[in-house]
Amino acid sequence: MSALKSLGNLLVAVVASALVMALCLAPIAGLGGAAIARTDETMQSNLSDLTHGDVPGVTTITDVNGKPMAWIFKQRRYEVPSEQISQYAKDALVSTEDRRFYVHEGVDMQGFARALVTNVLAGGVEQGASTVNQQYVKNYLWLIDAENEEEALAATEQSIPRKLREMRMASDLDKTLEKDEILTRYLNLVSFGQHSFGIEAAARTYFDTSAAKLNPAQAAMLVGLLQSVEALNPYTNPEGAVRRRNVVLNNMAAQGYIEQSEADRWAGAPLGILDKPKTLPEGCITAGDNGFMCDYALRYLAEKGLDLDTIKNGSYTIKTTLDPNIQQVALNAVRNNVSPHTAGVAQVLDIVEPGADSRNIKAMVSSRFYGLDLDQSQTILPQPVSLVGNGAGSVFKIFTAAAAL
């Protein structure tokens, strides 16, 4: 046994030395292909994106009172500062994904080598090797930086050159950011399943709470999902989610973040998730009768240079001038006059507040419902307004008649 242990230690030392040399030589190792070349370029020279770049969030479109009427996004994420993330979540992450996080400098060569030797001797994957820094780099290049599927595959491909570049970027990251900032950025970035990205969206999705209020069991379940959000989905595999949660709780206890008695107590508790995940509808199509105003606002902003892709990648609040009370009166008026189900007819009405400097749109309605299902009397056309203005129609006849008199 002692000889085997000595052999293992020797192998660890040899592998660690080889990895250090490879890491030093990484800049000259080529991956081939345009997408892989771009990933390499990002890893070498675009550290500012990894350390200061924004991540996609949720843009909210509101009425004049600030009440949300639609949400626009590519990834449902709410970026929150460190102080709004439960310490339990950070402790769960470190104890499970990277126990030497506060000791290493972005790349845990000792842990990497030991995991490699363990896996070789075991004939399979027994230990992971990526640090939190490395996982952050990989996820950022995959979720944020990749512009197409090919680049996403290049950012996550299983190859030694890509891994070495990832390690180098992880090391640079550690020199640039404080440890807590790395944890915060990581927890704001990654996917937790159910179309939730970042710890805040995950907390809302599964527990209808905030990231700041996560208890040890909730934090442990969410961190446990990172191993495989599909296989450990608590709605389709609750037993697996419980087992993984309890592993994380025991890791937290073993690392001294919570007492073992506390871990045991939480391990005996049910998952406590919502009956169904709390999601968020996306797009003007979900705004109901406010959809026409939502659509108009997006088209107006596009004319001003703020395109839909930018809005979907931002975390903006777009406050419209729509007044819900006036909107309801206008809606009742057109639908009392023309039924939404009248074939071939759609009556529209805009109410615009006059003014010298601005003319605020207070209501924008159609007798038909906003939507894409014609069988349900829905339409997105004709729009109540146009960016080139509405025709005055018969309104001007009175002026012609007055002139004739």
Predicted regions mapped to residue ranges:
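N-terminal type II signal-anchor transmembrane helix
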Residues: M1-T60
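Short, positively charged
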Residues: A29-M43, E157, K304-L306, L322-R335
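Extracytoplasmic low-complexity, Pro/Thr/Ser/Ala/Gly-rich segments
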Residues: R38-Y78, K276-P281, A287-G288, C294-E303
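Peptidoglycan glycan-strand catalytic modules in the bacterial/periplasmic cell-wall system
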Residues: V55-V58, T62-Y257, F369
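Short pre-catalytic segments that frame enzyme active sites
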Residues: K67-Y78, A201, T205, E230-P234, ...
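Surface-exposed intrinsically disordered loops and tails
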Residues: E149, I273-D289, A356-S358, L374-Q376, ...
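Short amphipathic alpha-helical coiled-coil/interface segments
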Residues: R244-L249, A267-L271, V334, D357
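Non-catalytic structural connector segments
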Residues: E259-K319, Q327-Q328, N332, V338-V345
